Design a protein with these regions (language model features):
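Short alpha-helix plus adjacent loop in nuclease-associated cores
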Residues: 103-120
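N-terminal glycine/serine-rich phosphate-binding loop of ATP-dependent small-molecule kinases
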Residues: 1-100, 128
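Short, charged, surface-exposed secondary-structure boundary motifs
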Residues: 41-45, 113-116, 193-195
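Gly/Ser/Thr-rich active-site cleft segment
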Residues: 15, 26, 126-211
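Hydrophobic or amphipathic alpha-helical targeting/insertion segments
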Residues: 95-98, 116-121, 125
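Short beta-strand-loop/turn "lid" adjacent to the catalytic site in phosphate-handling enzymes
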Residues: 67-105, 133-139, 172-195
């Protein structure tokens, strides 16, 4: 029914739902699927999601749209991802399992840590390198919290056994069966760890956040 070079899939992993839409070469949507995501609020100001559910719901949406068109993944020319960019996931390189729930962009648990960095006079340096304000909204302090509060996390990170990613990285890791641990500039630039002037992870920022 469709040529194998004309279809593009779009994955949209938002805060409240996962969606997949398949478009033809003219940009006309041919099939779509959407599934809700569960949010958890264990304490005031904390917002979490199950990273496994994120992957499963997104996969179900993609497979559903392919099934509607009687296609397999090989019938797609390309696949694009849009996502909640600051949400933070840390998982085991060996097992592919998250070591903690995804900490959502709305989460404010690291406000006191960010305030200490501000009081230390580090905000101008951070802003100059990243173009961002120093705020719990972004990923860096969330990664620091996981390393400090999940048992054994920092030791495993030092041993090279853990991977960090925003939601796009987590989805690509799973879509590729663990072969691709990647992101792009638009997501990396929302972590507070990425130098926007040279487009590299910044060692000084990593040291500041203790990652």
């Amino acid at each position: 029914m469709y040529g194998t070079t004309e279809l593009i899939a779009s994955l949209d992993l938002g805060t409240t739902s996962a969606r997949a839409i398949i478009f033809n070469a003219e940009g006309r949507p041919l099939a779509a699927s959407q599934k809700p995501l569960t949010q958890y609020f264990p304490h005031d100001g904390w917002v979490e999601q199950d990273a496994e559910e994120i992957w499963q719901k997104q996969k179900e949406c993609l497979l559903g749209t392919l099934a509607d068109l009687k296609l397999s993944g090989s019938g797609l020319r390309a696949l694009g991802i849009t996502n909640q960019r600051e949400t933070t996931i840390v998982w085991s390189k060996k097992t592919g399992k998250p070591i903690y729930r995804a900490i959502v962009w709305q989460d404010r648990r690291t406000a006191a840590f960010c305030e200490r960095l501000h009081d230390s006079g580090l905000e101008p340096l951070i802003h100059d390198k990243t173009g961002l304000c120093l705020d719990p909204y972004f990923s860096a302090s969330k990664v620091r919290w996981i390393l400090d509060n999940v048992e054994g996390a920092r030791e495993k990170a030092l041993a090279g056994e853990l991977l960090f990613g925003t939601v796009d990285s987590w989805l690509i890791w799973n879509l590729t069966g663990g072969l691709g641990h990647v992101t792009d500039v638009s997501n990396a630039s929302r972590t507070l760890l990425f130098n926007i002037h040279n487009c590299r992870w910044d060692e000084e920022l990593l040291d500041i956040f203790g990652i």
